[in-house]
Every structure is written in structure tokens, then in C-alpha cells.
Amino acid sequence: MWFMYLLSWLSLFIQVAFITLAVAAGLYYLAELIEEYTVATSRIIKYMIWFSTAVLIGLYVFERFPTSMIGVGLFTNLVYFGLLQTFPFIMLTSPNFILSCGLVVVNHYLACQFFAEEYYPFSEVLAYFTFCLWIIPFAFFVSLSAGENVLPSTMQPGDDVVSNYFTKGKRGKRLGILVVFSFIKEAILPSRQKIY
């Protein structure tokens, strides 16, 4: 009896580890795709916002969801369109980004309050949360790294922090300590040159 109980906990641990690794690998691959195809990603996010808007309008017309919840959801989608204007460069300190984060919290509060008072099956509640609350912020979250398009191979020689600090803009003059640091940098981290 105890042996089977121990095996069940061990198998649960292994399954959770595999699921976590699979989700991490999927997110990494998705982030790579978003970074590679930013224009297509922007278009997909725009269509997702339109779809979420249509779902919110449908919930208001057909299901009689509260006006406040639908209104805040539609306003949040407008803020998402504002974020999309500068995509893939999203400033975490911009008022638009901060407002969208605040509206996500407000939307969750209104949805939890509504679904606590009104009974809906779990699958319908999950559908609302997925299409109206989670999918667009998740898309923006995964694409946050797409604006960081500075790759190590695009760096110009001598543009590293050490070189800029010691030369202070004087490229022609090389001081003794700079030569030592350049030698150490090339010895430890050799730059990769493309050979054709």
C-alpha cells in the first residue's frame, strides 16, 4: 500500500517536470518565432484584439453580461491597440503599458466578482478568461523580447563598454590598459567572423 502511494507521488513529480519543460520549450520557440517575424506577429495580435472585441460584444448582446465589465474590456482592447502602435518596442515605463497592466487587474476583479455571483459552468468561465482576459496580455508578454534586436554578431569592433570607457570617444589613440583589456577580451571571448 505505501509503496504504490510513494510511486504515485514520484510519477506525479516526473510528470510535472516534463510538463514544465515542455511549456518552457514551447515558450522559447514561440519567443524565437515572434522575434523573427515581428510584422506577422503584430498582425496576429491585431486580429486577436479584434476577435476579443467581437467576443465581448457578443457576450453583451447574447448573454447580457454587465455593461461595466464589457465596457472595461473594450477600453482595455483600445489600450492594447495603443500598445500595438509601437510594437515590438514596448517601453515598460510608458503610461500605455502601465495602464494596460492596471486594466488587466481591474478586468480580473470584475470577472471574478461577476462569476462569483452568477453560475456558469467551468468551461464557459475558462473560455471567457482565455479569450477576453489572458490571450492578448500573454501575446504581449511573450513578445517583450522581440524589441531587443541587438545580436552579438551586429556589434561593431571596439563598441564594447570597456573600449568606450577608456577611449572616451578617441578611437585613434590606444592606451596601455586598453590594449591589455582588448587582448584579454579577444583571448577569453574571441569574436566570431563569418568566413565566406
Swiss-Prot record:
Assigned keywords, A-Z: Membrane, Transmembrane, Transmembrane helix
UniProt key word rRNA processing: no
Pfam families named among the record's database cross-references: Erv26 (PF04148)
Membrane topology note: Multi-pass membrane protein
GO biological process: endoplasmic reticulum to Golgi vesicle-mediated transport
Entry GO CC: COPII-coated ER to Golgi transport vesicle; endoplasmic reticulum membrane; Golgi membrane
Family statement drawn from the similarity comment of this UniProt entry: Belongs to the SVP26 family.
Annotated protein name in UniProt: Protein TEX261
Organism of this sequence: Pongo abelii (Sumatran orangutan)
Gene from which the chain derives: TEX261
